[in-house]
Amino acid sequence: MIKTSQIAKYIFLLKKAEFIKSEKKHVILNKTTLKKMVFILQNKYDEQTVFFILEKLKEIGFHLATQSGLSLGIDDLKSFPDKKKLITETRTDLNNNEEHFLLQNISPLEKSKYLITKWNDVNNFIIQRIKKVFLKKEPLNPLALMAFSGARGNISQVSQLIGLRGLMTDPLGKLVEFPIQGNFREGMTLTEYFISCYGARKGLVDTALRTATAGYLTRRLVYVVQHIFISIEDCNVTNGISVEINEKSSNSLIGLTLLKNFYNKNIFIAKNTIISPTLVKLLLNSYNYLSHKKSIVCRSILTCQLQHTLCQFCYGWDNARAKRVAIGEAIGIIAAQSIGEPGTQLTLRTFHTGGVGGFSGANWISYNSPFDGFIKFKKPVIGNILRSWIVMPHYTSLNLVYKLTPSFNELNLTLFIFDKLKNELYNKTLKNEGLLFVREGDFIKKGQLLFSEININFKNSNLLKTYIPYYSLETGLIISPKLALNKYLYPLWIFLFNIIKLNLDSLNSKKFTVYKNYSILEKNDLIDLKTILFEIHFIQKSKKFNLKKQEYLLYQNLKMSLCKSHYDYSTYKKLNVAFQQNNQKLNFFYNKKLKSSLVSNNINLLWTSSSYSINILTKSIFNIIVFEYLYLSLLIKNKYILWILSKNLKKKDKFHFFKYTSTSSSKIEIFRLNSKKNSLNIRKNKLFFYSQNYKKNKVSNILFGNSIFLKFPLKKINTFFSQIKQKTINLKEKKTSNVEGEFIGFQLKNNIKFWYSISPNSLFSFKKDNKKNRYNFNFIRKNSNISGFLVSNTIKTFTLQKGIPLIFPSDTIYHKMEKDFIFKNELLCSFKSLKPETQDIIQGIPRVEKLLEGRPLPFYKPKVELYKIWQFFLKNLGFLKIKNSLFNLKKVESKVYLNNFKPNLNIGDICYLAYFHSKSNFGLDIASIISNVYLQEGVNISFKHIELIVRELTSLVEIINPGDSGFIVKEKIHWLLIYNYNKRLKSLNLKEISYMPIFLGMTEITKKKNSFGVAGSFQNLREIIIDHTFTRKTDYLLGLHENVLFNKIIPAGTGFFF
């Protein structure tokens, strides 16, 4: 049992440590204050004293928790009082946004972004209100104690319990634009429950599958840097990186070592001094007084001159102890675990959040008005009117957004809000670049958006432009008025139609889908497609004909076909059919001439013909023949274009056909094109037939009238004749059409007819009521009392077809052309956007993995970027002729410090300088990208850990010209080894080695290690054994892994060198 006197003693120790520095008498020790307390204690006392205090604090915590008997019941889940009112206001706002969309003021993407942003703001507002209610009214609520102390859960989970769940993610990680307005306390509707299951299932799948991915990432990182530890105090490097002195870079300055003396007026800092938080504050306070030096040159891990290890000065501060790192510290293992471990933990965290979307929109810092009033600016605003997809769509009275541009020094905009009596109520000074949503003299309401600061680095941001597909919401015809609203936005209309997709049995007109009148067939393509050319229905007039049937005894391998008497017919009336007919020729064009033949003998062109049996049920209709072409698994030897020409069926055309009945089971007709023939002619008004079963012993016979042509050495079994004397008219059975409305024909250049119908629901008429200036085929928007496409204008009425107006940015990629038909949920276009999507570590881990493996990302290609930067430095080295100058590469947001520059450079010096600058700039760039992935999840990984990984991935160089050395072109060697070789070659007046930097991924760099133990135990053991055997490599056991394998003491540890 802990006594009260002991508790007082420990609290006295805390006061002695100057931790409690507040005017309040009581300080709540939550997670944040505990972190601060441990940090102060660590700086104030030794490790043993700090350990003693923290151990006793733990005992106090367990004792008080047992004594309190904390429990959580359903009564502790208090509902949020203003939730219904807030949701009603949000719905009204979203309805207004829908009106903007129908008025063609905003694009579909902006509509979607506004919905997502609005519900995200609602969720954040509810979270803030829950915090205030709990902290003020119920600070001892068990739910509040757990969430705010950091012991269990977070405020996001509390919001799902008593607030609203908000927008959920689907299995692909995208947001479902249907917010769950209920919570677990109130319950959810059936629709909300099913959407909620999306996110819950995603959490389960991610936990089951992605945890292994995070663990494997950690394993590869450890293999890359396990051999790195602190070996000496100083490597005597002369180059470093330049870090700007400002508030944004203040955290990155802490723990770095100065490369050279820094002095400016009253400030002097000696070189090799570690920058502490106190020094950072001193530099920031004197920032405005600095004349020409607004940056400071520091050492970096990327510039350390040691090959296998690091020095104390280049590494800097030990983050765990806030002191200079000790010699022997295994910093490689620490760096690998620091990057890999958050991935494992955050993967598990997505399971507990239940799939609720997290937004990358946190990069936007918004300021809202606290009162009603009028806007007044202190000085004129410098900026441009912006109307684009970059901004988050917030709408003022004039739908204008101002993008502010910084002045020569800094942007300093002060907003004043006055009431009606011109009393100042509120003022806010804005320092960052951003978007202004109000104008001078505007009347604003409480809570209205005033300004948004942009806190985005577009090069490294996950909000980079990506193509987002847009699918049509309706079926109809695409029309573009060809009138741009401005240079950024273009309008588009989709008019509602019912496109017919029916069989001939249901409707007397058939829809034939024709996408284009030619096909380009590539070499080695396998084609399996079937297109109907046309079908013929006919009505039989009074006609007599003989029907003859004969049977023959056939041998086993003999096949034959019988042909009945032909039918002679003509059309009885005009047929309402639209069809595509093979017009005269079927031509094959090749991309090059062949010497031997046009078509290979192995290519078969297959045709099919459908035969129909006549019985009682089907005798009223004859389907004579279906003309079609079929490519069945046809292997194209060379590229050619197949042209299908089109022609209409004319009235009272007369045809003669033969109807075949095959005695075999096969119904495929095979034609082999002659190698000297490049066209197949089909002529009208000629008797023609295609023989079936093109095989070895095939025999055909043809009967004309009563004539018999038989050359058959077989025994005849029986013969019978039948004659039809009566006149018959066979009519097609009538059926009710399942399509209603008015049919409209639509004809293209090649006489291909389309048929589509306008349903009664998409047409409406109204009286004119003195409306003027209305003409046929006018586009009429909403709020003109009518909206759509004017198709009829009579004396008394208008007839209007409903349509959906859309606008898209000018760089949109359209997948449909004007006057094309589009079906519902069919892809219409793709457009670039900075649309915020859900960002969790599940999307972050693959991005980090790709970067560290050297694979290209949509916005970044590591290997290409490194090569470009190296070429840039190689071409511009002639401009670096000033000693002690700062060199700034414009494409990358970092500076490299160059000391003791010599104008007369040889090839070795040029290669070293170009490699050094490109490696430093590229390393800082890719390290910042990886760091941002974790920062979006609230995990702050020390920059030096990422620099350590990148340093190893860029440590090898590729030899371009070996010079007088014994290396081989394209051989990959450590850069410091080449640097020392060049020094030796230069002293002997021999030709030096020229080389270029390369970026190898984690897997590649591990395989290229000189250590057989590391490379062999990683993967591809057989390949590693062959490589090390033939090249006779020696493993010097320099790393930790190799020594553990061979049961030797590891060359690391803070007591190893003493």
Curated annotation (Swiss-Prot):
Q: Where in the cell is it found?
A: Plastid
Sorted alphabetically, which keywords does the UniProt record give? DNA-directed RNA polymerase, Metal-binding, Nucleotidyltransferase, Plastid, Transcription, Transferase, Zinc
Tell me, which GO biological process terms does this entry list? DNA-templated transcription
Catalytic activity, reaction form: RNA(n) + a ribonucleoside 5'-triphosphate = RNA(n+1) + diphosphate
EC supergroup of this enzyme = transferase
Q: Where does Zn(2+) bind?
A: C235, C304, C311, C314
Name one cellular component (GO) term.
mitochondrion
User: In the record's cofactor note, how is the cofactor described as bound?
Assistant: Binds 1 Zn(2+) ion per subunit.
- Provide the E.C. number(s) assigned to this enzyme: 2.7.7.6
Q: Name one GO molecular function term.
A: DNA-directed RNA polymerase activity
> What cofactors are annotated for this protein?
Zn(2+)
**Stored PANTHER family:** DNA-DIRECTED RNA POLYMERASE (PTHR19376), DNA-DIRECTED RNA POLYMERASE SUBUNIT BETA (PTHR19376:SF54)
Q: How does it assemble?
A: In plastids the minimal PEP RNA polymerase catalytic core is composed of four subunits: alpha, beta, beta', and beta''. When a (nuclear-encoded) sigma factor is associated with the core the holoenzyme is formed, which can initiate transcription.
Q: Which family does it belong to?
A: Belongs to the RNA polymerase beta' chain family. RpoC2 subfamily.
User: Main role?
Assistant: DNA-dependent RNA polymerase catalyzes the transcription of DNA into RNA using the four ribonucleoside triphosphates as substrates.
Protein name per the record: DNA-directed RNA polymerase subunit beta''
UniProt source species: Helicosporidium sp. subsp. Simulium jonesii (Green alga)
